Amino acid sequence: MRKDFRQIAWDEPLQEDLRDLLRLAVREDLADAGDCTTLALVPEGARGRQAGVVAGLPAAAMALAQIDPRAHWRPQAEDGQTVGSGQCLARIEGPVHGILAAERLLLNLLGHLSGIATLARQYVEAVTGTKARIFDTRKTLPG
């Protein structure tokens, strides 16, 4: 029996799941005092250190809107795009406290999803020219 695999759709059920996940992440990251470490240690204008495949930009936009609806997200790249070290992925404008409150969550989210996308791209390239194919399957529990 052949199983039909297809690309994950950015549909309403997926967006609702993401909203639930973001609520948990915001509560965990910003429950009491906010992100004092980032405020103290991360320099303004910090950039990524490695090239890779970007993933999670729509999710990051939703995360920012949840933390501070007054902040504006302007993507400078697209999901699936290969980006270079230090390349700008998005520009954010808005109240500084809202942006700083969202910063750690955005970096964690984009770093995690882009890391997965980068590794997946390496696997796809490794099997190019063979009959092998790479598929995403969830082997973890929700939450």
Model-derived regions, located:
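Acidic/glycine-rich phosphate/pyrophosphate-binding loops and surrounding catalytic core
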Residues: 2-143
